Amino acid sequence: IGEGILISNGVSQLNDLDEYISNAGRNADSETDSDNYEKYDSAEALEEALNEKNLESNEELAETVQEALVEDSLADQVSVSFTAQYVQLSMKGALLFDSGSDSLKDQAKEVLDKVGVILERYGSNSTIEIEGHTDNVPIHSARFADNEELSSARALSVFYYLTETTSLDPSDLRHAGMGDRVPVADNSTEEGRSKNRRVEIRIYNPSTTY
């Protein structure tokens, strides 16, 4: 169950694997270092084991976040997915912004207040990324030259709101505008375009590299 493409950095991934091996050696009472290495016959097998471990961890976090959303009556407004790298919260653009605007609605602030508490509880030791996305309909605005600028401004608005209203460390938060480059639905229909207009917040697994 996940969205997006999992892309690994070769060097950092190998460092993670080395740490994984070291931890396994320190924590095993009855196994030698060579025994730990012999469990895997290649770097690819080690990488697969690490990814599987991260996937299980992120699945547990995603389930916990989903339960928190249900308790806060946000399950219909915020969807949750996960990969081996991160747990993702996705919100429709219409929930947060008026058409062509980067100013948060009052309703959006109420939702982000609750999402912020969840991020404080489960993402305070992680890198958190905020991404803005649009459909592929060209924007005609004196404020924004294109959808790329609009999506960037929307991600920044969410970033500023969270840094002002939560205890999250701003240095742990990232923001980016993706324009219409990463659609999750068919832009040829209104329903698809509505799904593509969104903001995603990702809580990265501490053992992965942002």
Where are the model-predicted features located?
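Juxtamembrane linker/hinge segments adjacent to a transmembrane helix in small membrane proteins
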Residues: 1-86, 92
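Short beta-strand elements
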Residues: 74-82, 126-129, 171-174
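Periplasmic OmpA-like peptidoglycan-binding domain that tethers envelope proteins to the cell wall
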Residues: 61, 90, 96-123, 133-210
